[in-house]
């Protein structure tokens, strides 16, 4: 099962959506306020769109087909929160139309979850 999840994550990394690519431009290589993110990162039996493991923050992008997955996402979010993660969800059109606000919201949560020096 673990090998299957890792294989699926690898495939998803190769086939990011346009909005995932746009967001990854900011989050990759510690470009985003020096926070390290992983894309399509497996946690338990789930694959997270973007994860900052040090702050335990998950960023998920949802598209139009997403309305069909509400119950699944609710279970998934509950499980992740029980494991100490905070899950931030954004619609793809928010990345397209309001990218700066999305980035501000992510940074605000990262700063809130990170220990002060």
From Swiss-Prot:
Q: Which SUPFAM superfamilies match?
A: Restriction endonuclease-like (SSF52980)
Under the heading CDD domains, the entry gives: Endonuclease_DUF559
Q: Where are the transmembrane segments?
A: none
Which InterPro entries does this one have? DUF559, Endonuclease_DUF559_bact, Restrct_endonuc-II-like
Instruction: Give the Pfam families listed for this entry.
Output: DUF559
Q: Which family does it belong to?
A: To H.influenzae HI_1162 and to HI_0925.
Q: What is this protein called?
A: Uncharacterized protein YcjD
Organism listed in the record: Escherichia coli (strain K12)
């Amino acid at each position: 099962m673990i090998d299957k999840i890792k294989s699926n994550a690898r495939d998803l990394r190769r086939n990011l959506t346009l909005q995932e690519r746009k967001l990854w431009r900011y989050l990759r290589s510690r470009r985003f306020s020096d926070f390290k993110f992983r894309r399509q990162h497996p946690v338990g039996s789930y694959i997270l769109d973007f994860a900052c493991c040090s702050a335990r923050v998950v960023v998920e992008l949802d598209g139009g087909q997403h309305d069909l997955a509400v119950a699944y996402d609710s279970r998934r979010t509950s499980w992740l929160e029980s494991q100490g993660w905070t899950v931030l969800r954004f619609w793809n059109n928010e990345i397209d139309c309001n990218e700066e606000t999305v980035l501000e919201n992510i940074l605000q949560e990262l700063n809130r979850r990170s220990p002060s020096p």
